[in-house]
């Protein structure tokens, strides 16, 4: 069920700050009939960028970035047309510390969606805090 329909979700200011955005991002959260697990969807209007990347270029940038990160917690799914996938399901990664990112794109419309599937309780604030501490102290994952 969707909520935050006023488009004033409490996390918008931090999304804007950390992503260094000049405008508020569009965020429309929803909840379902499950105890944990989450899909975050980030819509991108690529045509608003100075240089418009293709979906493949966007995918390659994310895949290259996460391939070099120790620990391998984040996986970027193979790029291609996906109409439906059993893996794009909120509970798919429950009980893990993993995240899977999907890049869905329509190059003709210069639009893309980034989808991230993860266990919001296992990958929640406490897990993120430990990973941030490790980064700050120069420790491994």
Name these PLM-found stretches.
Residues 1-114:
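C-terminal substrate-binding/catalytic lobe of Rossmann-fold NAD(P)-dependent oxidoreductases
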Residues 98-141:
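NAD(P)-dependent Rossmann-like dehydrogenase/reductase catalytic/cofactor-binding core
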């Amino acid at each position: 069920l969707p909520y935050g329909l006023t488009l004033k979700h409490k996390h918008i200011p931090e999304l804007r700050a950390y992503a260094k955005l000049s405008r508020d991002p569009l965020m429309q959260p929803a909840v379902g009939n499950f105890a944990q697990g989450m899909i975050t969807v980030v819509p991108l209007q690529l045509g608003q960028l100075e240089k418009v990347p293709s979906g493949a270029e966007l995918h390659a940038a994310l895949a290259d970035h996460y391939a070099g990160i120790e620990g391998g917690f984040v996986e970027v799914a193979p790029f291609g047309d996906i109409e439906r996938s059993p893996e794009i399901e909120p509970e798919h990664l429950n009980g893990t510390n993993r995240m899977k990112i999907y890049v869905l794109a329509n190059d003709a419309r210069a639009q893309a969606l980034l989808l991230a599937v993860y266990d919001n309780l296992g990958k929640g604030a406490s897990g993120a805090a430990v990973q941030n501490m490790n980064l700050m102290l120069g420790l491994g994952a």
